[in-house]
C-alpha cells in the first residue's frame, strides 16, 4: 500500500466485502484515471473464521461506490461517546475483520471505519471520527516501520490535535526481514484480535 499510494497519477482501492469489490470495480471502469484494486486472498470465499461478513448478496447491475468514500462498519453508542468511553478504529481490507474480532466485549464503545479507498482518502470521515471520539487506533497489515498508516497518523494528529485525548496508536505486522513460509509463523507475524485488543485497552484507559 505504501508503495502504490506514492505513485503519482493512480488511484488505489482496497475492498473488504464482495459488494464493495463490485462497486469499486465499476467505479474504476468509469474513472478516467488508472485505478489499482487490491484484494486480500484471506477474504476469498470467506473460509477463514471471522471473515463471514465479507460475503454479501450481489448488488444491482448499476451499483457503483464513489472512489474516496469510506464505510462505517460499526458505530458507538451516544452514551459511551458522551462519557469519553469510546474510540474509533480506521482500517481497510482484512484489517476490518481483525478489528471486529478485537471489538468483541466492547459493544457500543468502538466505531469502525473501513477506508475502502487508500488514494484518494476520505479525510472528512477520518477527521469526523477524531473529533467524535478523541481516541484513534489505526490497523494495517504492513509492518510498523515506514507503513502507509504512519502518514495518516501524522496528518490526523496535525489536523485534530485539539480534539485528541490520547496519541494515535497503530497496529501492524511484526517487523521482520521477510515473511515466513511456515503458516504458524506467518500468523504470529500478522496483526490479530489480541494485538488489537491490547491497544484498545490502552486507549480506553486514557
Features from the language model and the residues they span:
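Conserved thiamine diphosphate
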Residues: 1-31, 173, 199, 204
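Residue-level detector of structured alpha->beta connecting loops
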Residues: 8-9, 32-33, 107, 134
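Non-catalytic, usually N-terminal nucleic-acid engagement modules in DNA/RNA processing proteins
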Residues: 37
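Thiamine diphosphate
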Residues: 41-42, 46-206
Amino acid at each position: 500500500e505504501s508503495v502504490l499510494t506514492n505513485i503519482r497519477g493512480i488511484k488505489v482501492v482496497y475492498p473488504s466485502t464482495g459488494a464493495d469489490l463490485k462497486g469499486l470495480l465499476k467505479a474504476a471502469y468509469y474513472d478516467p484515471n488508472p485505478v489499482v484494486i487490491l484484494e486480500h486472498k484471506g477474504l476469498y470465499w470467506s473460509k477463514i473464521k471471522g471473515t463471514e461478513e465479507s460475503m454479501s448478496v450481489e448488488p444491482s447491475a448499476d451499483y457503483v461506490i464513489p472512489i474516496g468514500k469510506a464505510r462505517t462498519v460499526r458505530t458507538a453508542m451516544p452514551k459511551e461517546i458522551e462519557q469519553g468511553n469510546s474510540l474509533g478504529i480506521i482500517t481497510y481490507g482484512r484489517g476490518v475483520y481483525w478489528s471486529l474480532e478485537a471489538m468483541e466485549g466492547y459493544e457500543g464503545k468502538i466505531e469502525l471505519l473501513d477506508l475502502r479507498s487508500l488514494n484518494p482518502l476520505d479525510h472528512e470521515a477520518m477527521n469526523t471520527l477524531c473529533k467524535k471520539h478523541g481516541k484513534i487506533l489505526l490497523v494495517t497489515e504492513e509492518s510498523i516501520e515506514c507503513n502507509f498508516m504512519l502518514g495518516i497518523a501524522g496528518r490526523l494528529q496535525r489536523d485534530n490535535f485539539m480534539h485528541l485525548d490520547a496519541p494515535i496508536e497503530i497496529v501492524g505486522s511484526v517487523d521482520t526481514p521477510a515473511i515466513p513460509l511456515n503458516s504458524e509463523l506467518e500468523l504470529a507475524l500478522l496483526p490479530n484480535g489480541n494485538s488489537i485488543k491490547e491497544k484498545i485497552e490502552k486507549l480506553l484507559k486514557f
